[in-house]
Structure formats: C-alpha cells, structure tokens
C-alpha cells in the first residue's frame, strides 16, 4: 500500500530529519531473475545485501520492500548501534557453552565497529559516533544486577585482546541524583538509522 510522502516523514524523528526523497519506488511489473531475493528493507535486509555484494560483487541481489527502506522498526528505533545483549554471558554459557558465550559477546562488540567501518567505506554519512553508553543503577537490586553483569563480562574474557569491556562506575564517578552507580559499555554508538 503506497502512502502519501508526508505520512512517511511522520513515522519517526529519523524519517522527518533525513532530508531524502521518501517517495516509494514503483511496484514490480514482472518477474526478476536474481541470485538472492531479500524480503524487507530494514537494517537487517540492507546489511545482508551489502554483505553479500562485498563478498561476491557479481551476485544479483534484489531487496523487496512493501513501503520504503527503514519503514518498520529499523527506522523507528533509538538510533543506537549497541553490543548490549538481553541475556548475560552466564545465561548464554549455561545453554550453549562457554566458548559460544565468549564468541557471541565478541561478535556483538565487533559488529558495532564493523557498522562504523562499513558506513565510512560506503560514504554513508549516518552520524556514526562511538562513545559508549552509561546505564544507571538507582537502587540496590539494580546495583547487584549491574555488578553481576560486569563480573560475568570479566569472567568470560570479552575484554581480552583489546576488545571493549563493561565497567562499573561508582556513585563518586556517576554523580547523578539518586544513582548508586552505573555501568559503562564502550561498545555502543549512535547513528541516524534513516540515512
């Protein structure tokens, strides 16, 4: 379903500020002969197409998107490229083994840097800046959970070999009203996802 251009701009801050033409491309008018068809023009679909073409430049790739690139969650997110993961390394290790937990954390960290490198190599000015993220703990329960995350990160060696690692910042360093401390994760960047 094709929507009016103004409605795409109202989807999110990112669409409103991108400055590009948000007119949907025309529908397919026939069959295509391609090697790979990717359904969805979000970050995952675009990244997959880019990666395929980097690995095999002659590959015939098409991205099929009903609306516009970044229409769904990719264009309505917080603008973060982060190695934060909803499960701890301890939880991953319990289910998949220690090596898999370490590999996952390292892959998450390396992906943040790879996104920055890829954007620069492709000449995409997406306002990529990697400066980390701070997550505040405001009570004892949050402090204990944060300390467990830091300990798990250290125990699983994700900070070895110069790879970024999670740090605990005490209240003297945080100096935020009501905070008992915070974690700092250097493996986080901000970017403009609609660019």
Placement of each model-derived feature along the sequence:
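Extreme N-terminal leader/targeting segments of oxidoreductases
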Residues: 1-36, 54-60
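Flavin (FAD/FMN) cofactor-binding and adjacent substrate-gating region
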Residues: 2-10, 16-18, 87-94, 117-195
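Glycine-rich Rossmann-fold phosphate-binding loop(s) that bind the pyrophosphate
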Residues: 40-46, 66
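Glycine-rich FAD pyrophosphate-binding loop
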Residues: 53-76
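Glycine-rich active-site loop/strand segments that organize a redox cofactor
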Residues: 76-107
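A non-catalytic, amphipathic alpha-helix used as a structural packing/dimerization or gating element
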Residues: 99-117, 148
């Amino acid at each position: 379903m094709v929507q009016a251009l103004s409605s795409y701009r109202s989807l999110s801050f990112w669409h409103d500020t991108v400055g590009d033409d948000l007119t949907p491309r025309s529908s397919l008018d026939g069959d295509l002969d391609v090697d790979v068809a990717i359904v969805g023009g979000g970050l995952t679909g675009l990244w997959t197409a880019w990666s395929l073409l980097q690995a095999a430049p002659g590959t015939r790739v098409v991205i099929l998107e009903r609306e516009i690139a970044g229409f769904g969650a990719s264009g309505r997110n917080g603008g973060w490229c982060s190695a934060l993961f909803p499960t701890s390394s301890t939880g991953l290790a319990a289910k998949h083994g220690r090596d898999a937990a370490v590999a996952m954390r390292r892959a998450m960290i390396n992906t943040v840097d790879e996104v920055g490198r890829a954007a620069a190599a492709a000449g995409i000015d997406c306002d990529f800046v990697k400066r980390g993220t701070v997550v505040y703990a405001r009570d004892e329960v949050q402090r204990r959970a944060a300390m467990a995350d830091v300990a798990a990160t250290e125990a699983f060696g994700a900070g070895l070999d110069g790879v970024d690692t999670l740090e605990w910042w005490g209240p003297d360093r945080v100096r935020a009203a009501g905070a008992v401390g915070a974690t700092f994760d250097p493996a986080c960047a901000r970017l403009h996802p609609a660019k």
